[in-house]
């Protein structure tokens, strides 16, 4: 279970970051990722977002209720 609570305001921040393709920092299972937010998605009926690693171009999917933290950084 996530220690991080998704409020309406935080989801709005994520959606704005996706619209503007901004960088976001997320923690999942003790690892921090810095990615460019691309789009919302679902994985096995769970809300998620897809981000692109800025150095490698790899697309990564993050299930929202698995994240420990989230922050828009640029």
Language-model segments: what does each one mean?
Residues 45-50:
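Short aromatic-glycine-enriched beta-strand elements
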Residues 1-17:
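Mixed-charge, Lys/Arg-rich low-complexity intrinsically disordered regions
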Residues 18-28:
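A short, Trp-centered hydrophobic/proline-enriched beta-strand micro-motif
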Residues 28-30, 44, 55:
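A generic beta-sheet turn/junction motif
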